[in-house]
Amino acid sequence: MAAETGTAKPARAKKEPQPLVIPKNATDEQRLRLERLMRNPDKLAAIPERPKEWSPRSAPEFVRDVMGSSAGAGSGEFHVYRHLRRREYQRQEFLDRVSEKHNLDDDFQRKLMENKKLEEEKTAKRRLKRQKLKEKKKMAKMAKKEEKKEEIEKHVELDNSPESSDKSDLEDQ
């Protein structure tokens, strides 16, 4: 009937059936995700934000009623005291962990700098050694060239000497 009235809906484009692929390892899984993303490059990829690190509530600046665990406190007060104490212990433990992490990071950075300095020293030492060897080879090459040049000059002198010309004159006769 819809065809008769002229208000027919256009046919929806069917999606191509995708073969079922089960990733065997992490690289296959990554490849499949990338292929899926690249099918429609205009669509924005969802990048999850990093979860915030847990931190305890800050300690109150002013506590109006300071309670203790003494025998004079009522039973309701003890629970309040216990919760406050637990929160304070959590806060102190958190601060200790942050401090420890900071110390470890500083030690790591210091160690990295020491290693980098040692590597640079080794590299400089090796570079100097290479340069010395290169210079030594260059000097040997120059000495060999000079020696060859002197030898050629010696031969030229012998050829131009009067004794050699006398010998050649004798040979001509």
Swiss-Prot record:
GO terms for biological process, alphabetical: mRNA processing; RNA splicing
Keywords: Coiled coil, mRNA processing, mRNA splicing, Nucleus, Spliceosome
Residue segments, region Required for nuclear localization: 125-137
Coiled coil spans: 99-161
Cell compartment(s), UniProt: Nucleus; Nucleus, Nucleolus
Residue ranges of the region described as Disordered: 1-27, 115-173
GO molecular function, one term: double-stranded RNA binding
Region (Required for RNA-binding): 50-142
Annotated Basic and acidic residues bias: 143-173
Source organism superkingdom: Eukaryota
Keyword Ribonucleoprotein: no
Any one of the GO CC terms: spliceosomal complex
Pfam family, one: DUF1168
Compositional bias per record (Basic residues), positions renumbered to this chain: 124-142
Primary localisation category: nucleus
Entry-linked InterPro entries: Prkrip1 (IPR009548)
Biological role stated in the UniProt entry: Required for pre-mRNA splicing as component of the spliceosome. Binds double-stranded RNA.
Entry's family note: Belongs to the PRKRIP1 family.
Record-linked PANTHER family: PRKR-INTERACTING PROTEIN 1
Complex formation: Component of the pre-catalytic and post-catalytic spliceosome complexes.
Protein name according to UniProt: PRKR-interacting protein 1 homolog
Organism of this sequence: Xenopus tropicalis
